[in-house]
Amino acid sequence: MSNKLAEIGNNIDSRYTAASGIRRQINKVFPTHWSFMLGEIALYSFIILLLTGVYLTLFFDPSITKVIYDGAYLPLNGVEMSRAYETALNLSFEVRGGLFIRQMHHWAALTFMVSMTVHMLRIFFTGAFRRPREANWIIGCVLLFLGMAEGFMGYSLPDDLLSGVGLRIMSAIILALPIIGTWLHWLIFGGDFPSDLMLDRFYIAHVLIIPGIILGLIAAHLALVWYQKHTQFPGAGRTENNVVGVRILPVFILETSSFGLVTFGVLALLAGLTSINAIWNLGPYNPSQVSAGSQPDIYMLWTDGAARVMPAWELYIGSYTIPGAFWVALLCGVLVGLLVGYPFIEKKITGDDAHHNLLQRPRDVPVRTSLGVMAIVFYFLLTLSGGNDLFAYHFEVSLNAMTWVGRIGLIVLPPLAYFITYRICLGLQRSDREVLEHGIETGVIKIMPNGAFVEVHQPLGPVDEHGHPVPLPYAGAPVPKQLNDLGFGGEPGRGGYFTPDNDSLAAKYAEIEHENHLEEMAMYKNLQKNNRAQDGVEED
């Protein structure tokens, strides 16, 4: 078998001379920090979305034609509904595995959006968007917005009461746009709301157009990551010109494949054990049945919250009236613009035009970190405001009061979050500098000859002639704060949950770790030697 594979490989290489290029690519090194797996959750969620979506398209009809339901769900028998809602019910109750696949599709959509958001937060707070990766930041923003549009269209397709209310709100916001509102509404909905072409257009966009664009952007995103090399956190042996981690074969490919299977398993468990978007409890869309308690999915809830807390300000220009819903669209547009343009805004203010492959700790960039926390607080306040009617109902308070709580909170809390975060970052910086200057606190108290009590510190570097630690420069890497971080606590034992490894196996592990340590030390010495040679520093 191996000879046959070798023969096939030789035949391919003789025609395309791909061996040398493939060898270089499979030797690519990936960092091992856990936060780099956040983007992979989004990737695997999108793959699951494609697979489950293909299955759902086999049984779903997006027609808005009215029919009388006569199916497995008895409470709705004899009720007039659209063909789209009927096929969604049939898919849930009569197609084998249909409900499981539909719920897995919905959970994967939520996971896709949440993982993309958290992934972008990691990129923002660590400065991974800086030059030369501005293009990837823009691609990520476009992916986030396309994911929101794709999800909104997806849960609008069943034509249930909740999705219909969401579409009606979106229709009103689009119509409130000056000049282009009417034309944009016609382009999206195909006429007045609801129109006969509405779901057909959503279906084409949801199944063909937007997934194709997302797939192309993901490919471009991964290609840029591969070509520009991966960022990494500062640490021993890590520079702007190298990457420390594991090779793609065999370690990384095994880790990422296992992580993909875990993602698939978690989504399958969620789909099988928890119910989501139970459209049979909502009934078909009926404009006369619109009520409170109508919230979209979590990634769109902030837009609903903006519509709820925005004052009803109407703008009159001559004989034209701009409705209050326009300000909601304007606010969303401003937030989107700030998100996309932030790398260029920061570059303009700081004047930083250098290439960056090493990441930053959030505490080292307090202004950016504080702005990020401020934006997160603003987003969560809008999200909570999207459910202000539920808060008012369950806590028996005035809905008007809850609306004003959201308005005042949006003005007061984000600046407060900025101030608190900024002070926390400065405090963490002082904590790092204190350890670098004085050493790690040991908890040992020593009595001086004059009767004073002082705490003994463990220096991180050399000491002067008086025994005082020599202050060390901060290199952007985590600073050890406890003696266990330096290995004083020893290493944990090896073995299973209940039994340790035997002595011979433990000795073998220790020997391997010692060899790896010697190899790592030799690598660091060679790296230091090469760096000094490049800088023109002579060896001692």
Curated annotation (Swiss-Prot):
It catalyses: a quinol + 2 Fe(III)-[cytochrome c](out) = a quinone + 2 Fe(II)-[cytochrome c](out) + 2 H(+)(out). GO terms for molecular function: metal ion binding; ubiquinol-cytochrome-c reductase activity. Pfam families: Cytochrom_B_N_2. It is a multi-pass membrane protein. Its EC number is 7.1.1.8. GO terms for cellular component: plasma membrane. Heme 2 binds at H119, H221. Binds 2 heme groups non-covalently per subunit. This is Cytochrome bc1 complex cytochrome b subunit. Heme 1 binds at H105, H206.
